[in-house]
Structures are given as structure tokens and as C-alpha cells.
């Protein structure tokens, strides 16, 4: 082969090289365009999902973060009704008459006493206005000086029910301040004995409750807050 023919073959190969390279470059451009389109669609889909579910963008819940939580009207009315029902429950707290001599007499018209929401005081008894559970409580304070004889002090809360004609004791307690009689000529030392009673009972409308002692002459009327009787609806 001559030198001229070899040179001609090389020139022909160089002319054909761009044509052969054009095929791979075209397919590469198509692949890049497809990848760009896929990424664009995927990005748009992701952005839509984030906006739809509130991950990004303005959040309405933050507008109420500084104020009180939103409460439906029905829930507000229910809570208000429950509060009003609690305030409407019957309640009584009466205190002893400090002017009574050797008698336990209950008074409701005092600064530290009350009758509310249907509770009544009649014949020294508290009258229940409606059926339900009630907390009943009472306290008395006995005092004396020396022991002329053996003493038994009792405090009792009784119920006179509409459905039962006889009085029934609900709460009762006994205390003895004197174990033995004070001898003649010995020092007569003062003594004090408090008794507190309390319990929960099912009562009916019209029931009458009384708090009594067996020896009222030993009651200490020095302070009205020491002797009291009360009922609270639960």
C-alpha cells in the first residue's frame, strides 16, 4: 500500500468519526431530559403533599397558641350547668345558742351559720329538701371542774325518716372524763371533752335530723365555733 492511499484512509476515518459519535450524544440528551422531567414531577408532588398536610406554610393552630384553647359551645354549656348544679345543692350549718341555759338549741341566723338551697330548721331539727347522699357532721365540747361522780357524756345524731315512724340513731359517741369521783377536799381540776361525729347517708325528702347530748349542762358555750351541726348534699 502506498503512502498516499494510507493518508486517504486516515482522512476518511476522521470524517466518519463525528457521524458515529453523534448517536451516543443524542441518547445521552434524551436520558438527561427524562431524568429532569421525573425530578420536576416528583418535586411538585412532594410540595403539594407538604402543603396539603400542613407541614409547611401558615399553620392556623399557632394563631390560638397565645389565647385560651377553643372549647365547643356544647361543652361550655355542660360545664356551666355542672357548676350551677353544684352550687344548687342543699347545705346547712347551724351553731349552738350561747344564750340558752343547759339546753342545746340550734340557730341558723348567725354570721357563721347558713341554710341554703331548700334546707330548713324546724323544731331544732334540720329538714332535708330532696333525696340523695348527704354528709352529716356535728361537734360538741363538754367542760367541767372536778368529778362529783362518774360521768358518761354522749353525743348522738338521729334521723326521723318519712318512711319510718321512729327515730333512728345514725351517729353516736360516748366519753368519760372522770374515771373516779374527786375526793372531798381535793383540788377540783378543770377538764374538757370534745366529741366529733361525721358520716355519709342516703336520705329522703322530708327526713328530719337532730343532734343531741345527754348532759347539756356540761356544754361549753364560750365560743360559737366549738358546737355546731351540719348537712351537705353530695
Swiss-Prot record:
List residues in topological domain: Cytoplasmic: 1-35
Assembly? Homotrimer. Interacts with SPPL2B.
Q: Report the locations given in the UniProt record.
A: Cell membrane
Q: What is the lineage of its organism?
A: Eukaryota, Metazoa, Chordata, Craniata, Vertebrata
Q: Name one GO molecular function term.
A: tumor necrosis factor receptor binding
Q: Which organism is it from?
A: Cavia porcellus (Guinea pig)
InterPro entries given in the database record: TNF, TNF_alpha, TNF_CS, TNF_dom, Tumour_necrosis_fac-like_dom
Gene (name only): TNF
Entry protein name: Tumor necrosis factor
Family, per entry: Belongs to the tumor necrosis factor family.
